[in-house]
A protein has these predicted regions:
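Acidic catalytic/metal-coordinating carboxylates
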Residues: 32-35, 58-61
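Two-component/phosphorelay signaling modules centered on CheY-like receiver
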Residues: 11-28
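Receiver (REC) domain active-site loop signature in two-component systems and cognate sites
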Residues: 54
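Active-site beta3 strand of CheY-like receiver
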Residues: 44-49
Length: 147
């Protein structure tokens, strides 16, 4: 069972994601990036799911900390910013995925499952086979057409 950390200052979104992900994973929540960093120090997480715009440290700053200290931990960004350049920029910085608010729960679940598998493969030192790489590329936000 994967350990997921959900970070969002909006209690409704945070609790909705936690309830959804708790069906298949162990889930903890944090309402700020600062609380998330403390939880990351105390526990090991397989995936971090974070909002980008929060009071205090932003999700972008959290992404930087996670990439630096926990490079095998995928970070999924959830944001209301529908700018394709913004999404591509965060992916280039190292975010595993970029999901738009409002989001569909099945899309979040699929992204988390891919991130868990990605982390497992990184830890094992394996890579995606051809079919899996093609499927992952099909989900790449750089292919999105945001309107």
């Amino acid at each position: 069972m994967a350990e997921i950390l959900v970070v969002d200052d909006d209690a409704l979104i945070r609790n909705t994601l936690s309830e959804l992900l708790s069906l298949q994973h162990k889930c903890q929540t944090a309402e700020t990036a600062e609380i998330a960093l403390a939880k990351l120090e105390a526990d090991s997480f397989d995936v971090v799911l974070t909002d980008i715009s929060m009071p205090g440290l932003s999700g972008l700053e959290l992404l930087g900390h996670v990439l630096q200290k926990y490079p095998h931990t995928p970070v999924i960004i959830i944001s209301g910013i529908s700018d394709q350049d913004h999404a591509q920029g965060l992916i280039k910085l190292g975010a595993f995925d970029y999901l738009l608010k409002p989001f569909r729960l099945e899309v979040v679940e699929k992204s988390v499952m891919r991130a868990v598998e990605h982390r497992r493969r990184l830890q094992e030192g394996t890579t995606l086979d051809g079919d899996e790489a093609e499927a992952a590329a099909a989900d790449d936000p750089t292919d999105w057409k945001i309107v």
